[in-house]
Amino acid sequence: TRSSVESRGLGDVYKRQILIYTAPEIARNLLRFRYSMLEQARTRAREMNLQGALFPWRTSNGEEASAYYAAGTAQYHINADIMYALKKYAEITNDKSLLYNEGVEMLVETARMWVDLGFYSDRKGGKFCINGVTGPDEYTTVVNNNAYTNMMARENLFFAVKTVKEMLDAYPDQYENLKHRTNLETDEIDAWQKAADNMYVPFDRKLGIHPQDEDFLDLEAWDIKNTPRELFPLLLHYHPLVIYRHQVIKQADVVLAMFLLGNLFTDKQKKRNFDYYDPLTTGDSSLSACIQSIIAAEVGANEKAMGYARYAVLMDLADVGGNMAEGCHIASMGGTWMVAVYGFAGMRDYDGHITFEP
């Protein structure tokens, strides 16, 4: 299956949200496009000294096309992002054919990658930790225990366990075929469950927030308010090493986790996380404003919700970034749909259950 839409970064989360509900056949084709890259992803994992498969951060043909590893290849969460899109698609469409064929094979290989990438740390009470990764925020790179990455990896592992066990119970012939295709061993499934059950997720009890990563709260906060507007986006005006030693965020990270996995956060945690991270977020990525708008609406910051919504809607219409000549921001367009549906209409769709709270 080929695609005219490149596979890049968080597009699996942003574009597929709207497509699953409005054009599920296209969402299905895009997931099958990802599956067509699985062999290259297996090769990429071996290059990175890992088992399983590691999908590229940017690609049009299955080969990694990112120029800068810290803001590209280090975003291992791409595996979990793709599997999140698969999970949403399966829950909403009930398409067992895709899930139990191409989908489950990707689940097996991505789960293998996670248990090989992480380890059980005695210093963290035996919790499963994932080090040397970059989360969605590309202004904070190659860190330990990025909250978004760990939480999404946990969902990836849980979903892999659930799907494989369902196949074993309900479709034993297909399960045997899967074992043959992937050399799956029963003890691997137990290893996925154990890693997911013991996943380390940073939390600061004093502040009542989820630190973006292990060391984020120890960094000096960037003075965004007094940084001249002409020096944004920061990545075009400051050396990465200057940016990396500060608390400054290119795009929603913990806040994105609160949108995708909102049922895992309390209302108080959402409010405190948003209040802490929003002032540190530059919005230098076109993918940030839509997520900030959705969570702002949820926590009652209505003026901010509307302001971010306007910014997201005008990203291409008003050429906010000054780069429309290079093409439309497809993922951001998907984000504007999410603002209307998830933000102002208050829709949530966790575990296949849809609710509305406008």
Model feature map: region roles:
Residues 109, 113-184:
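Acidic/histidine-rich catalytic neighborhood
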Residues 1-10:
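Single conserved hydrophobic/aromatic residue that forms the stacking wall/gate
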Residues 329-358:
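Catalytic cores of secreted or luminal carbohydrate-active enzymes
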Residues 25-84, 90, 94-101, 114-127, ...:
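Helix-terminus loop motifs that line ligand-binding clefts
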Residues 25-31, 163-174, 304, 346-357:
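Acidic/polar loop patches that form or flank catalytic/metal-binding clefts of enzymes
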Residues 79, 83-86, 149, 157, ...:
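TPR repeat positional signature
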Residues 11-37, 101, 158, 165, ...:
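Active-site core of glycosidic bond-cleaving carbohydrate-active enzymes
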Residues 107, 292, 340:
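Hydrophobic, well-ordered secondary-structure elements that form the walls
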